[in-house]
From Swiss-Prot:
PANTHER family associated with the record: GLYCOSYLTRANSFERASE, UDP-N-ACETYLGLUCOSAMINE--N-ACETYLMURAMYL-(PENTAPEPTIDE) PYROPHOSPHORYL-UNDECAPRENOL N-ACETYLGLUCOSAMINE TRANSFERASE 1
Top class in the EC scheme: transferase
Function: Cell wall formation. Catalyzes the transfer of a GlcNAc subunit on undecaprenyl-pyrophosphoryl-MurNAc-pentapeptide (lipid intermediate I) to form undecaprenyl-pyrophosphoryl-MurNAc-(pentapeptide)GlcNAc (lipid intermediate II).
HAMAP family listed in its UniProt record: MurG (MF_00033)
Gene Ontology CC: one annotated term: plasma membrane
Record keyword Cell membrane present: yes
Biological or metabolic pathway of the protein: Cell wall biogenesis; peptidoglycan biosynthesis
Native source organism of the sequence: Rickettsia felis (strain ATCC VR-1525 / URRWXCal2) (Rickettsia azadi)
A GO molecular function held by the record: UDP-N-acetyl-D-glucosamine:N-acetylmuramoyl-L-alanyl-D-glutamyl-meso-2,6-diaminopimelyl-D-alanyl-D-alanine-diphosphoundecaprenol 4-beta-N-acetylglucosaminlytransferase activity
Protein name in UniProt: UDP-N-acetylglucosamine--N-acetylmuramyl-(pentapeptide) pyrophosphoryl-undecaprenol N-acetylglucosamine transferase
Principal localisation: membrane
Catalytic activity: di-trans,octa-cis-undecaprenyl diphospho-N-acetyl-alpha-D-muramoyl-L-alanyl-D-glutamyl-meso-2,6-diaminopimeloyl-D-alanyl-D-alanine + UDP-N-acetyl-alpha-D-glucosamine = di-trans,octa-cis-undecaprenyl diphospho-[N-acetyl-alpha-D-glucosaminyl-(1->4)]-N-acetyl-alpha-D-muramoyl-L-alanyl-D-glutamyl-meso-2,6-diaminopimeloyl-D-alanyl-D-alanine + UDP + H(+)
Cell compartment(s), UniProt: Cell inner membrane
Highest taxon listed in the record's lineage: Bacteria
Amino acid sequence: MKKIILVAGGTGGHFFPAVALGEELIKRGYEVHFITDLRCQKYINQNMGLIFHILDLKRSDNIFLFLPNLSIAILKAIKLLYNIRSSVIIGFGGYPVIAPMFAAIFLRVPIIIYEQNSYLGKVNKFFASFAKKIAISYEDVKNLPEFVKSKIVVTGGIVRENIRNVCHSRESGNDIKRSKDNIFTVFIFGGSQGAKLFSELIPASIQILMQKQPNLKLNIIQQAALDDQVKIKDIYSKLNINYEFAEFFDNMALKYKEADLVISRAGASTIEELTYIGLPAIFIPLPSAADNHQYYNAKLLADKKAGWCLEQNSISAEELADKILDLINNPKILEDTSQNLLKRRKEGHVLLSDLIERVI
C-alpha cells in the first residue's frame, strides 16, 4: 500500500481541508499520514481514519532562538519521514509545514503544494521551486513567481464532506430558505479575531436595519464570545427578533442550511464552503491577515458578482444595514449571486487526489 503524507496546522482553516483530502485518498486505498502541530491537536478525531503525528515548531521573532528550534524540528521531521517512506508529501502552507518540507527536500520525497488563498503565501512561495506541482483554488492567484507557472494546476477548494452534503439539500443553489412566516436568517460568524466588529458594529447595524423596516421578520445566528453575548442579547431582545448564540458552532453544515445570508471574515475555508453550497455572503476581511490575503479572497468573489466585500477600516453600521436591507428586499440579487458562486465550484478533493496520483 502506497503511503501519502499531508502537512497542515495552525488553524482549522488549514486542518479541515487537509482532512477532507485525506478521507478521499483513504477511499482510493492509500495509507495517509497527517503531520500537524499542537494548535490543531484539539481537532484530531481518530475516527477520521488518518494516522496523525504531532510535530511542533516553536515560533520566535528572535532569529537566534528560531534557528535552533527549526534545526531540531527538521531533524525530527527527517526521522519521521524516513520511517514513513511515503510516495509524496502535500503541504497546505503556513508555519507548521516548514520543517516537514525541508525534510522532504533532504530525503527527495516529491512535494506538492496546495494554496487555498487567492494570494500565494510566504511559506508556499519559498518552497514553490522545490515542488513537483502547485495546486491552487483560484485561477488567478496573485504573487506567483513566473518560473513556477508551468507547475500550476487549478483544483479548486477542498470542502468537508458534511458541508458538501448541504449543497444537495439546498437543491438550486441558495434556494432562499425562508420559512412560511417569511423569516430571513442571517448567519454571522468569524468574530474570534477583531471581535469588536462583530460584537458592536454588527448589532448596531441590525438596530438601524430594524428602525428602517420595523415589520421585518429577522432571525440572527451569531458566533459571539460569552462576555459579549449578554449585551448583544439585550439589543436583539429589544428589537423583538429571533436569535441564537454560540462561542463556536460545531454544526456548521446545519447552520449553513438554515441561512439566507452570511456575514463573515474571508478566510479560504469559509469562502470555499460558501462557494460550494452557493450561499451568498457579505465578507469583512480581517485586516491583519497575513499578506492581506482575506481581502484578496473577498475581492475576487466581489469582482465576479459572487459576494460583497466591505473593508473593516471604512465600513459604518449604516452602510452595513443598508446592504443587508437591499439584499433582503431583492431576493433576485441573492439568487443571482448564488448561481455565480456555484459556477466557480469544483470538486477540489477529487481533482487534487487525481493530481497526487499522477505525481506518484
